[in-house]
Every structure is written in structure tokens, then in C-alpha cells.
A protein has these predicted regions:
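Intrinsically disordered, low-complexity non-transmembrane regions of multi-pass membrane transporters
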Residues: 1-4, 193-208, 244-251, 258-259, ...
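N-terminal signal-anchor module of multipass membrane proteins
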Residues: 1-58, 65-78
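Hydrophobic, membrane-embedded alpha-helices of multi-pass small-molecule transporters
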Residues: 3-15, 145-155, 172-173, 188, ...
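Juxtamembrane interface elements at the cytosolic ends of transmembrane helices
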Residues: 16-20, 154-164, 172, 183, ...
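Membrane-embedded helical hairpins/re-entrant loop segments and their flanking transmembrane helices
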Residues: 24-47, 225-296
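Short, non-helical or kinked segments that cap or interrupt transmembrane helices
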Residues: 31-35, 54-66, 108-117, 170-175, ...
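Interfacial segments of multi-pass membrane proteins
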Residues: 69-75, 162, 284-299, 305-310
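Membrane-embedded alpha-helical modules
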Residues: 76-192, 303-412
Length: 412
């Protein structure tokens, strides 16, 4: 079970640490730290497992949807603005969870039906594709042959293991692919061990203690909190995708109210401790899908490992030495798998594309989500930037509500 859990840790590690790195780059200073991001990721996952009574094999990691809002919230209201804004996001999740508990979840299904969820999941996966391409180094710049070789080997080893291996090896294809790519990277001289030397053996993450270090920042809250409406849709989409994979309706059992409650409390706790907002991780969902191991115990152990790692700088340093082409090769499979799950939602719900309304909703979401569309809402107090998946989700929901079906048959 330990090896299975390590596979999930490696799957989430790159994206989880990338969020604080990107936020800090945009803000021009340290807003978030990697150890706190790892700690709140693991703690948040355990909170989620507790709230869902151990019935949903979901891992929570740092959300990409909040990268720009967090950076702008920091510029508007400092770390207090960031922390309280993320706390407010979690609070919105909890409120929606309570409403679902009282009134049921039919209303949210009408608001966000499969015709919206399917392309939303596709945008999540395909929207991450440029990251994988960039990690490999085949995005139009000077080609590094060593990078390309490492990425190809990592990809092929993972794909062959997933499709041809037998027994225990078949359920750890990503771990085998990463190890193979890492060893080859060492042989080719692509691994830089200086990051390990710089890290201390043991250090306590730089937490921001609840209610002690905070000052009320309305600007920060208004910059971050509105994104919750988008990530709730992402939450629903991810759980529908996982339901398809494990052949169990997670929306009914443990229930959308419990999954949102777990995600919400986890996000609020992350905000109060100085971590990024949490979200259900498609990378780990892909691992579940390809390995066919949907064990909550494995996810829980991965969360505990993430918490432990956050206190040991040397371990973080070792994981940070994994070259980008290794992660890029693996990500080709991970992100593609996410996109295909979106397609499966459309197919399994028998979305009728003879109905022009459905064509308009899906096509508009795909173009906006993958076309680099960005809308900035700038006022005296806020600077909200909506782009990619977030923008596609909002427009998809609006179009689905205002357009009429052109055929008598409705989507299932």
C-alpha cells in the first residue's frame, strides 16, 4: 500500500508545488510556501475523507484556478487578504453544501448538467496540455534532445506498464515511469542535486496562525471569493468523472453535500494556515482510472506522507530534482486521461448533438477554455481575472440556462 500511496504523492507533487511558485512569480515576492502547500494538501485530503466517511477516493491539492486571484489579492490586501479570501471560498462551499443537504442536489444538476460538465472536464485536461509540452521542451524553442529522450522513455514505460504489465506492476505504472525517467536523467546529467544541499533536514512550515496574524481585508476577499462559483462546478465535474471511472455514483453516496463540505472545510483551513485553496486533483483521479485501484486508504496514506514531507526539507529537495521532461512525459497521459473522461461524460449521458443548443454550449466552452480567452474586471477595490476553465464554465452555465432546446428530446 505504501508504494501505491507514493505513486499518488508523485502524481500530485509537481502541480501542488507549482501553484506557490507561480503565485510568488506573479506577485514578485513570497506569498505562499511549498511546505505549507504540501501540509494543507495532505491535511485537506484527510478532512475530506473524514467528511465523506471514507467513501470517496479523492486527493485534494493546490488549485490552479486561484493563481492569479491570489497574486492580485496579495497586492490588494497582503497575506491577510489572501488568507481570508481563501477562507471565504471554503465558506461558500460549506453554504452550498448545506443548501444541497436541505433542498437536494437536483437544482445544481439543472444548473450544471452533463452538457456543461463534459466539456468542462475536457477543458481542465486539455488546458493543462501546454504545461506538459513546455516541460518536455517541444513548444517551438530550441530542442533539447536529452529532454525529448527522457520524456519519451517516461511516457513509453508508463504506457507499456499500464497496458501490458501483470500483477502488482500493473497498478504502479506512473511510479515505474517516473523512476525510469529519473534514472535515465541522472545518466544523462540532467539532475541538479544542489537543491538538496540547500534544504535543511527538518523545519517547521511557515504557517500563518488562525486569527493571530490576520487583519480584515475586504479587497482581498472580493478578489478571490467569486472564483468559488467556478470551482464548485469543477468539483462537480471531477466527481462525476471519478464516478464514471470507479462505476459508483459519488454524487449520491457519499453525496454532493458531503464532498462539498469536505472540500470547503479543507480550503478554509488551508486559507487560515497560509496555504493555497484546495481542489480535487485530476492527476490523482487519472492514477485511479489507469491503475483501477480506488482505495481511500491509499489516498489517506498519500495525504499523511505529504504532511510528513512538508517538515523535511531534504525530501522536498529530492522530489524537486525530478527533471521537468520526466513529469512532462507522465503528464501527457495524465492530462489526456482527464480530457477523455470529459468525453465519456458526454457519451454516457447521450448528449444529442443534433440539438443545436448542445452544439453551441459545448463548442463555445471548448473554444473559450482552450483559446486563451481572459476577462479582467478591474475596480477600485478589486482586480478579478477570469480565464480558461473558469470563463468556459461561467459561459457554459449561462448559455445552457438561456438557450432553448431545438428538439423536443432533452438531455438525460
Amino acid at each position: 500500500m505504501l508504494i501505491l500511496a507514493l505513486q499518488h504523492v508523485l502524481a500530485m507533487f509537481g502541480a501542488t508545488i507549482l501553484v506557490p511558485i507561480l503565485v510568488n512569480e506573479i506577485a514578485g515576492c513570497e506569498v505562499l510556501t511549498i511546505p505549507v502547500a504540501l501540509f494543507t494538501s495532505g491535511l485537506g485530503t484527510l478532512i475530506y475523507i473524514l467528511c465523506t466517511k471514507g467513501k470517496s477516493p479523492v486527493y485534494l491539492g493546490s488549485s490552479f484556478a486561484f493563481i492569479s486571484p491570489i497574486a492580485y489579492a496579495y497586492l490588494a490586501g497582503g497575506k491577510s487578504g489572501v488568507g481570508l479570501g481563501i477562507f471565504a471560498v471554503g465558506l461558500i462551499y460549506v453554504i452550498v453544501a448545506i443548501l444541497i443537504k436541505i433542498f437536494g442536489h437536483d437544482w445544481i444538476h439543472k444548473l450544471i448538467p452533463p452538457v456543461v460538465i463534459g466539456p468542462m472536464i475536457m477543458v481542465i485536461g486539455l488546458g493543462l496540455a501546454p504545461t506538459a509540452i513546455s516541460e518536455i521542451g517541444i513548444n517551438g524553442g530550441d530542442l533539447n534532445l536529452k529532454y525529448l529522450i527522457v520524456a519519451i522513455v517516461s511516457f513509453i514505460v508508463t504506457a507499456i506498464t499500464a497496458t501490458r504489465a501483470k500483477g502488482f506492476l500493473k497498478i504502479i505504472p506512473f511510479l515505474i515511469g517516473i523512476v525510469s525517467g529519473y534514472v535515465l536523467s541522472i545518466i544523462l546529467g540532467l539532475v541538479d542535486f544542489t537543491s538538496i544541499q540547500k534544504e535543511s533536514y527538518f523545519s517547521i512550515p511557515k504557517f500563518i496562525l488562525p486569527f493571530k496574524d490576520y487583519a480584515l481585508s475586504l479587497k482581498g476577499i472580493l478578489t478571490i471569493a467569486p472564483i468559488a462559483l467556478v470551482t464548485i462546478a469543477e468539483h462537480l465535474g471531477d466527481h462525476m468523472a471519478l464516478s464514471t471511472i470507479i462505476k459508483k455514483d459519488l454524487i449520491k453516496d457519499p453525496g454532493l453535500d458531503k464532498t462539498l463540505l469536505g472540500d470547503g472545510i479543507a480550503t478554509s483551513v488551508a486559507g487560515l494556515l497560509g496555504g493555497p485553496a484546495n481542489t480535487t486533483y485530476g492527476e490523482n483521479t487519472s492514477v485511479v482510472g489507469m491503475t483501477k485501484v480506488a482505495s481511500v486508504k491509499v489516498i489517506g496514506l498519500a495525504a499523511i506522507i505529504a504532511i510528513i514531507i512538508s517538515f523535511f526539507g531534504k525530501i522536498i529537495g529530492v522530489l524537486a530534482t525530478i527533471p521537468s521532461p520526466v513529469l512532462g512525459g507522465i503528464s501527457l497521459l495524465l492530462y489526456g486521461f482527464i480530457a477523455v473522461n470529459g468525453l465519456k461524460v458526454i457519451v454516457q449521458n447521450q448528449i444529442d448533438f443534433d440539438d443545436v443548443k448542445n452544439v453551441i454550449v459545448v463548442s463555445t466552452m471548448l473554444v473559450l477554455g482552450l483559446g486563451g480567452a481572459i476577462i479582467s474586471i478591474i475596480t477600485k477595490n478589486t482586480n478579478i481575472q477570469i480565464s480558461g476553465m473558469s470563463l468556459a464554465a461561467i459561459i457554459g452555465i449561462i448559455l445552457n440556462l438561456i438557450l432553448s432546446n431545438t428538439k423536443k428530446e432533452t438531455n438525460k
